[in-house]
Amino acid sequence: MARRRRRACIALFLVLLFAFGTLMGLRTLKAPDGLPALGPGPELAPFERRPEGNPAPARAPAAPAAPPPPPPRTAAPRASLGPAEADPAPRQSLRVYSDLHAFYYSWYGSPRREGHYIHWDHVMVPHWDPKISASYPRGRHSPPDDLGSSFYPELGPYSSRDPDVLREHMTQLKEAAIGVLVLSWYPPGMADDNGEPTDDLVPAILDTAHQYNIQVAFHIQPYKGRDDITVHDNIKYIIDTYGSHGAFYRYKNSMGKSLPLFYIYDSYLTSPEAWAHLLTQNGPHSIRNTPYDGVFIALLVEESHTHDILAAGFDGMYTYFASNGFSFGSSHQNWKAVKNFCDTNNLMFIPSVGPGYIDTSIRPWNNHNTRNRVNGKYYETALQAALTVRPEIVSITSFNEWHEGTQIEKAVPKTTPTRLYLDYLPHQSSLYLELTRRWAEHFIKEKEQWLM
């Protein structure tokens, strides 16, 4: 009898032990507190990979309160947006928005088209202090494996003159809902220190953009001897040569007049007094109320430039730089004050947003200005900050400035014997195009509310 009771107790103990073990096992399957029960979207994914030893990103200043971000996409499978799977004709069903501008560079060349690489083999720029410069590598990059970029383009080190490249770029711009391509421009026969003249490529860019319902504005770069007189000649040349093209961008101002819009890079290199000769009503060679009038947007770098831009007769200002905190103009926390100044003085404020910044492939000493992409989070923070100030136009730095790592163009993972390139993993190469479209649609909806 005692033996039977002992067996029953042992059996009961084993049953209880089994039940307790099962319950504990089930508890281990529960998601830990603070983690999402579902798979992460782009905002929750792990940080992007970067080569060992790459500097940790500097923490950007907190962005101001912003409108709530648009709802994330579902995880439902969808067809690839790549050109190989898409219809070869322009995707006319996708809308683009003329209030969304992207800075575009046509300075790239390859042996297949130009006989040699252009810009992909960019020099490593020495620091202005010889003592600092001595600590960093010098020389020129050696494509195709070694590019003057921290990312590797999906198209490889391409030529901007390749018609297939132009079509693919317009496809990507359209996927991103970008309605205006802002073309980096030098006068005929001129180029930057690492490039070759590209004005003869403008007709092909205009023609291709027109097929995709994209418009083209001009980003006038600094060149030797640039002043108010030469810019007058530049404006006349651009309007006379390209102004009648269907893809030439014109902005409708508050008076209902459609005028060409020009971005003037490094405008602060010319004095406000000289600009006033060109941009004010009574200037000695004023273009106001002439066939060459336009909307002229100056670059804002330092806080004092706001008053210089106003005195010079410009119509507005943009910030260009994608490194939050790099300058007064590029710091998100200053945009509200800048917008208030512009509103008070009847100027347009065009904030520039970027997906990140890293130019150490060409300026190896400049790692303190690196801004990590954080899988799109940095980009979305900038877009939030821009929408908070209710701008008329948002500009994107950039579509394809690969040297400074600000591109939203598709990039792919790449490892060579001497280089480990950054990439967009764990996301697809189209991540920044998709984020741009999502925020563009949100921007347009917000604008409709602002105008009510």
From Swiss-Prot:
GO terms for cellular component: Golgi membrane. The keyword Transmembrane helix applies. InterPro entries: Glyco_Hydrolase_99 (IPR026071). It holds the Pfam family Glyco_hydro_99. Residues 30-452 are lumenal. Gene3D superfamilies: Glycosidases. It is a single-pass type II membrane protein. Its EC number is 3.2.1.-. The chain crosses the membrane at residues 9-29. GO terms for molecular function: hydrolase activity, acting on glycosyl bonds. It is found in: Golgi apparatus membrane. Residues 40-90 are annotated as: Disordered. Its main location: Golgi. Keywords: Golgi apparatus, Hydrolase, Membrane, Signal-anchor, Transmembrane, Transmembrane helix. Residues 64-74 have a biased composition (Pro residues). Residues 1-8 are cytoplasmic. Belongs to the glycosyl hydrolase 99 family. PANTHER family: ENDO-ALPHA-1,2-MANNOSIDASE, GLYCOPROTEIN ENDO-ALPHA-1,2-MANNOSIDASE-LIKE PROTEIN. This is Glycoprotein endo-alpha-1,2-mannosidase-like protein. It comes from Mus musculus.
